[in-house]
């Protein structure tokens, strides 16, 4: 029984560390948000999308509170040409309102924009 629990625990750990699916996007479509909702935050070095999500969640919790965790799973997008990440919350089908959004420069970790849809 312990062996089975160990194996099950191993799968849980492996599953939690799986890189989230990253979709493409064009940061040019988000210039309005960069202009209207700039941020002074900086996430520092970003090693991968898991690291990005951990750092983004800290920023979102500071800005919007713990309730932001209800917007999991977070969606990850990357503009390869410009080296920009976009992370968005997920709105459950039984909920109304908007989601948190953040644009981050991969090279510098600088948060370009931070906003919440309504």
Segments predicted by a language model, with ranges:
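Hydrophobic membrane-insertion alpha-helices, especially the h-region
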Residues: 1-10
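Ser/Thr/Pro/Gly-rich low-complexity linker/stalk segments immediately outside membranes or between
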Residues: 15-25
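Short, non-transmembrane alpha-helical segments in secretory-pathway proteins
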Residues: 29, 33-73
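Exposed beta-strand-loop-beta-strand "reactive/processing" segments of non-cytosolic proteins
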Residues: 67-117
């Amino acid at each position: 029984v312990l062996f089975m629990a160990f194996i099950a625990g191993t799968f849980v750990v492996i599953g939690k560390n799986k890189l989230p699916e990253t979709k493409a996007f064009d940061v040019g479509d988000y210039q309005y948000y960069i202009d209207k909702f700039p941020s002074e935050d900086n996430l520092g070095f970003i090693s991968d999308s898991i690291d990005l999500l951990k750092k983004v969640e800290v920023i979102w919790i500071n800005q919007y509170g713990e309730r932001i965790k209800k917007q999991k799973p977070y969606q990850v997008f990357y503009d390869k040409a410009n080296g920009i990440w976009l992370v968005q919350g997920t709105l459950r089908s039984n909920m109304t309102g908007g989601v948190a959004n953040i644009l981050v420069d991969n090279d510098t970790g600088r948060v370009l924009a931070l906003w919440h849809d309504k």
